[in-house]
């Protein structure tokens, strides 16, 4: 398992909370989060309790303020440790319910449009490993954690539309 430390103030100051497992509600430990240190593992942070709201993917490293993890505010209310796997495989479909097979990926894709000439993906099947989906190319914009399993519609991964810009494998390379 990984280890992550949340700090109420920027620059690793103020009250802190150390975490080494999934936590559906961080509100009892701190009221705001302005800096984070990830000592080990990869983590997905959520702006609301019970793994809801905006998602932020973090790897090992220091994040002295919330802009460093592309945060919109100092609200972090739940977190998940992402298990590491050595192999990754995902199937992308251009329509919902696994219709219109686009391709199978085993590596990162910085621009879905350049590779497949599509701006939208309506369903996915994650066969191996965990992935982070980004709504914009080059790993920017809203982020969504994809664990192994079925995603019949974009709502299943938490998105409000089918816009997909890039996909990245979750790998702790540091």
Swiss-Prot record:
Crystallins are the dominant structural components of the vertebrate eye lens. SMART domains: XTALbg. The keyword RNA-binding does not apply. The keyword Repeat applies. It comes from Mus musculus (Mouse). Pfam families: Crystall (PF00030). GO terms for molecular function: structural constituent of eye lens. Belongs to the beta/gamma-crystallin family. Has a two-domain beta-structure, folded into four very similar Greek key motifs. The gene is Cryga. There are six different gamma crystallins identified in mouse lens. SUPFAM superfamilies: gamma-Crystallin-like. This is Gamma-crystallin A.
